[in-house]
Swiss-Prot record:
Species whose genome carries this gene: Campylobacter jejuni
GO BP terms, alphabetized: response to antibiotic; ribosome disassembly; translation
Record's keyword terms, sorted: Antibiotic resistance, GTP-binding, Nucleotide-binding, Plasmid, Protein biosynthesis
InterPro entries, alphabetized: EF-G-like_DII, EFG_II, EFG_III/V, EFG_V-like, G_TR_CS, P-loop_NTPase, Ribosomal_Su5_D2-typ_SF, Ribsml_uS5_D2-typ_fold_subgr
GO molecular function: GTP binding; GTPase activity
A matching Pfam family: EFG_III
Name of this protein: Tetracycline resistance protein TetO
Domain tr-type G, chain residue ranges per copy: 1-244
Role, per record: Abolishes the inhibitory effect of tetracyclin on protein synthesis by a non-covalent modification of the ribosomes.
SMART domains reported for this sequence: EFG_IV
Organism classification: Bacteria, Pseudomonadati, Campylobacterota, Epsilonproteobacteria, Campylobacterales
Family, per entry: Belongs to the TRAFAC class translation factor GTPase superfamily. Classic translation factor GTPase family. TetM/TetO subfamily.
Residues involved in GTP binding: 10-17, 74-78, 128-131
């Protein structure tokens, strides 16, 4: 059986969840249509998803059409969740990108199409809601060519009499994009030679599979118009990316979720081989797991199964496998360009409104962060505050909704701030000697610190020989230094520097590794005070697509948001701006873009890295640190 893993992507409210329901219903997988408005759909499982009409988490369902099984990955549709969209894209064989006939090309549509192009995934356009009043399809086609790709091929005609309908487009004009993209076909066309239809279809299929030509289909998912034709196209046009002739197992985890009973499930795409119940599978050089339970999506539901074939998706109850874990032979994993998850750039504190729910909150955050690589948290050992780091503001809204709906926890979140870092300004050295007051430890430690280029991270080197100071003492110094790097002079993590252990002395038998471990952060702190530190803040690359009249406004607003526009291009009455901007300014910049372009502007961003902070920034008060504060107090007391 041919298995296709299909992604459905769209801007908010374009109808992708409704289309999923229509595909399941038309194929016979379900007997009754679910409704987004009534909250009865198979894929949107959270109240927030139903209330706002957006998909937040990736859901998996399936249907069968003749001898083809189609697994539908109903991917998220909000900009703050593109990281999960990218992760979902990595398991797809193809995608359907919805365009609302009424709303046209939205900013989110362009961002999703951009991601599909980067991943080189074969894509079909489905123009939805064609039965609404005031639809101008020729204008939608023009907009698609201008804002998405000129390489579209309109495969259907839309009629109005006696009622709205879709039929095959047999006009020769539809093949223009195919002919213009092939020199041999273009030469035939220019010389007036006849074409064989098989030549055109073969070239269309080649370019479609390469992700450079995009067929356009039409319908109304809400009324099941055009759904059957779309199913037939999906079953015939898309191919499974599973390598042929491979019997050895290879699979990869692309999603983790927890059930209401707190069972942990991992979603695995099988790329080759077959997974059987009771198989013992290697997941690393030293670790294996036994498959004791497994489920596969079948006709709109999940069913227990004894096998999962190549190309299919399998759900395993498992507490060991992590996102991107590989089952079996890693060499057989398809070589596809993956997009790395960006680092969280924002942090805040979260607290429960009812103190008795604190442990429930911590357990919930552990599960949520396990499922979402863009969320991290830790508990301050002294203040006991729960510190969250994440990527976007809407992510916080979703976390609060999950906490309330799934875990029944009411939480309060403080105003978030950007995560800064610190780098030494110059080289400096500092030494604290044994038996020299106020040093209370049986140890001498001398450290040097110097700045490195931004992006280098922390590099540690010991210049004290093991013959002079044994390994346990050396390890203790390194542990103390790295611990001390957690907070610099402004309370942020220290990075992009080289720290050298220059001098050490111990007294036998009274010295212990703890003496070196406790003294090292104090020495590092003094070295940092001599060196001074500069604040670094996260920067983003941005790419803005907006109406040409926005150009002057963009340059006018750039200094206000510390943005640096490095290139400008005019294309099809549209301006394309590229540049860099501090992450702390991007949300307001985006809001202004949306406001001044009436929602037509698009802003694509990716993390550039950290750069010296400019303009107004927020210093973080030094967090109480029981270990270092106690040692610091001892020094002051003995001084």
């Amino acid at each position: 059986m041919k298995i296709i893993n299909l992604g459905i992507l769209a801007h908010v409210d374009a109808g992708k969840t409704t289309l999923t329901e229509s595909l399941l219903y038309t194929s016979g997988a379900i007997a009754e249509l679910g409704s987004v408005d009534e909250g009865t759909t198979r894929t949107d499982t959270m109240n927030l998803e139903r209330q706002r009409g957006i998909t937040i988490q990736t859901a998996v369902t399936s249907f069968q059409w003749e001898d083809v099984k189609v697994n539908i990955i109903d991917t998220p549709g909000h900009m703050d969740f593109l990281a999960e969209v990218y992760r979902s894209l990595s398991v797809l064989d193809g995608a359907v990108l919805l365009v609302s006939a009424k709303d046209g090309i939205q900013a989110q549509t362009r961002i999703l199409f951009h991601a599909l192009q980067i991943m080189k995934i074969p894509t079909i356009f489905f123009i939805n809601k064609i039965d609404q009043e005031g639809i101008d399809l020729p204008m939608v086609y023009r907009e698609m060519k201008a804002k998405l790709s000129s390489e579209i091929i309109v495969k259907q005609k839309v009629g109005q009499h006696p009622h709205i309908n879709v039929t095959d487009n047999d006009d020769m004009e539809q093949w223009d994009a195919v002919i213009m993209g092939n020199d041999e076909l273009l030469e035939k066309y220019m010389s007036g030679k006849p074409f064989k239809m098989s030549e055109l279809e073969q070239e269309e299929n080649r370019r479609f599979q390469n992700g450079t030509l995009f067929p356009v289909y039409h319908g109304s998912a809400k009324n099941n118009l055009g759904t059957r034709q779309l199913i037939e196209v999906i079953a015939s046009k898309f191919y499974s990316s599973t390598p042929e002739g491979q019997s050895e197992l290879c699979g990869q985890v692309f999603k983790i979720e927890y059930s209401e009973k707190r069972r942990r499930f991992v979603y695995v795409r099988i790329y080759s081989g077959t997974l059987h119940l009771r198989d013992v599978i290697r997941i690393s050089e030293k670790e294996k797991i036994k498959i004791t339970e497994m489920y596969v999506p079948t006709n709109g539901e999940l069913y227990s199964s004894d096998t999962a074939c190549s190309g299919d998706i399998v759900i395993l109850p498992n507490d060991v496998l992590q996102l991107n874990s590989i089952l079996g032979n890693e060499i057989l994993l398809p070589q596809r360009k993956f997009i790395e998850n960006p680092l969280p750039m924002i942090q805040t504190t979260i607290a429960v409104k009812k103190s008795e729910q604190r442990e429930i909150l911590l357990g919930a955050l552990t599960e949520i962060s396990d499922c979402d690589p863009l969320l991290k948290y830790y508990v301050d050992t002294t203040t006991h505050e729960i510190i969250l780091s994440f990527l976007g503001n809407v992510q916080m809204e979703v976390i609060c909704a999950i906490l309330e709906e799934k875990y029944h926890v009411e939480a309060e979140i403080k105003e978030p701030t950007v995560i800064y870092m610190e780098r030494p300004l110059r080289k400096a050295e500092y030494t604290i000697h044994i038996e020299v007051p106020p040093n209370p430890f049986w140890a001498s430690v001398g450290l040097s610190i110097e700045p490195l280029p931004i992006g280098s991270g922390v590099q540690y080197e010991s210049r004290v020989s093991l013959g002079y100071l044994n390994q346990s003492f050396q390890n203790a110094v390194m542990e103390g230094v790295l611990y001390g790097c957690e907070q610099g002079l402004y309370g942020w993590k220290v990075t992009d520097c080289k720290i050298c252990f220059e001098y050490g002395l111990y007294y036998s038998p009274v010295s212990t590794p703890a003496d070196f471990r406790l003294l090292s952060p104090i020495v590092l702190e003094q070295a940092l005070k001599k060196a001074g530190t500069e604040l670094l803040e996260p920067y983003l690359h941005f790419e803005i697509y907006a109406p040409q009249e926005y150009l002057s406004r963009a340059y006018h607003d750039a200094p206000r948001y510390c943005a640096d526009i490095v290139s400008t291009q005019i294309k099809n009455d549209e301006v394309i701006l590229k540049g860099e901007i501090p992450a702390r300014c991007i949300q307001e910049y985006r809001n202004d873009l949306t406001y001044f372009t009436n929602g037509q502007g698009v802003c694509l961003t990716e993390l550039k890295g950290y750069q010296p902070a400019i303009g107004k920034f927020i210093c973080q008060p030094r967090r109480p640190n029981s270990r270092i504060d106690k040692v610091r107090h001892m020094f002051h007391k003995l001084a």
